[in-house]
């Protein structure tokens, strides 16, 4: 009874062109852009109105600690998380939602999201600081023909986001991944201008 009028108001605002992607009305309407159902409206719609709406520029990042309710609304992203079997859903999904456990674990303290630009490690590689011992993430940007050598401390994964590279005589293109063993020294040669992301376990 409460959600339907809210969605109707959102639809009117979008139709008038008075809202942008920085307004929760825009996203609430997008979820039900094909029509507002008469029953069983997803209660997760409420979360759009209480969460921060954050636009993360290309190749920038954000760290979200345990207990932070979040949703990815648009675009492509890389998500790293600690090994866990207790992921809880808050809505916007047909899957089961354990409300009691969700309330128990969610951190209800207001936050001011901070965009991570990355810290320079070398001319080619930047590190996104993550204040946890479970994982780390770097971005490697190479010009065409450039060769870059990395030494792995742990089991590491490389994801090619843009371009094409040769890693130890094997060709990789955008969307491909390579798994590196611990204590390996690997040469990456960029066939074209290339961007890769490296996931690793910190020392």
Language-model regions, residue ranges each:
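Glycine- and acidic-residue-biased ligand/ion/polar-headgroup-sensing regions
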Residues: 17-31, 36-43, 73-76, 144-170, ...
